[in-house]
From Swiss-Prot:
Belongs to the KAE1 / TsaD family. Pfam families: TsaD (PF00814). One of its GO terms (cellular component) is cytoplasm. The lineage of its organism: Bacteria, Bacillati, Mycoplasmatota, Mollicutes, Entomoplasmatales. Keywords: Acyltransferase, Cytoplasm, Iron, Metal-binding, Transferase, tRNA processing. Its EC number is 2.3.1.234. Its cofactor is Fe(2+). Binds 1 Fe(2+) ion per subunit. The keyword tRNA processing applies. This is tRNA N6-adenosine threonylcarbamoyltransferase.
Length: 317
């Protein structure tokens, strides 16, 4: 069973082909260089660049997987959530291909895809406890099957990735800010500044607006005083506060729900501290199936959509 999957929810246009659970190809057209000067993704530009990249991405996916379009059995695409213009482009491409080869169309959820990106090389044993961390989402999900997802907690304001990017912008690090802060944090003292660990309560919800404001205020105060900004120390202290609450909420969820698989998903799953937290908690609570996605599957890609589609189809047979 061959599935062609399309991911276009933001500034990546990606096509992947999977054959009976094995990824044959995962072509990604990234637009980071085009958006960096704007300090973030420009929706109209993202959609226009998707249009320009469709042809070569499709051609590359078919050629690199040695697949003829007629050999595809199902066509999957990201339906939501995301930038509306970018999503429409992906949907139209998927509908066109499915109509041309007369094969079923599968609209899928972007976040569910991210979670299954972690299962590309590691099979899930249910129930799965998944920590979703990205530019648009920060949430904890219980996954009981490819068709059963329960969000037990989510951010009430800023997502963790959004917070990283905004702090990085004020620090003058540019976009995308997450990897740059993570790298700087390795050189800094996490105890140099005491930033608030927000939403430190019994719920599974998150809040990052207070942390973001606290860091920005420190930077502005130092700037107004004409003092040097210790970027490494600020990065380390910020990262500690941003990730410590993830550790606390996840540990509470592990104790309550007793998952058989522990994983993390989304663009911020590439963060070194987040990855360390996942592996440490898995070891502490003897969760044998504890894993983080390969770096290539952390950010948006169609392989994760292809794997989700495959698992859904397999579960229905």
């Amino acid at each position: 069973m061959k599935i062609l999957a399309i991911e276009s929810s933001c500034d990546e246009f990606s096509i992947s082909i999977i054959d009976d659970g094995k990824i044959l190809t995962n072509i990604i057209s990234s637009q980071i260089d085009q958006h960096v000067n704007f300090g973030g993704v420009v929706p109209e530009l993202a959609a226009r660049l998707h249009l320009e990249n469709i042809s070569w991405v499709i051609k590359s996916a078919l050629e690199s997987s040695n697949t003829k379009i007629e050999e595809i059995d199902h066509v999957a695409y990201t339906e939501k959530p995301g930038l509306i213009g970018s999503l429409i482009i992906g949907k139209l491409v998927a509908e066109t291909i499915a109509s041309y080869i007369d094969k079923p169309l599968m609209p899928l959820h972007h976040i569910e895809g991210h979670i299954y990106g972690a299962s590309i090389e590691n099979e899930f044993v249910y129930p799965v406890l998944a920590m979703v961390v990205s530019g648009g989402h920060t949430q904890i999900e219980i996954v009981n099957s490819p068709n059963e997802f329960e969000v037990i907690g989510a951010t009430l304001d800023d997502a963790i990735g959004e917070c990283y990017d905004k702090v990085a912008r004020v620090m003058g690090l540019g976009y995308p800010g997450g990897p740059k802060i993570d790298k700087l944090a390795q050189k800094g003292n996490k105890e140099a500044f005491i930033f608030p660990i927000s939403k430190n309560d019994d719920s599974y919800d998150f809040s990052y607006s207070g942390l973001k404001t606290a860091v920005i205020n420190i930077i502005h105060n130092l700037t107004q005083k004409g003092e040097e900004i210790p970027v490494a120390d600020i990065a380390a202290s910020f990262q500690y506060a941003a990730t410590k609450i993830v550790e606390k909420k996840l540990e509470k969820a592990i104790i309550q729900f007793k998952p058989k698989t522990l994983t993390v998903a989304g663009g911020v799953s590439a963060n070194s501290e987040i990855r360390n937290i996942i592996m440490s908690l898995g070891k502490k609570y003897n969760i044998t199936n504890t894993f983080v996605p390969k770096m290539e599957y952390c950010t948006d890609n169609a392989a994760m959509i292809a794997k989700l589609a495959y698992e859904k189809l397999k579960s229905s047979n």
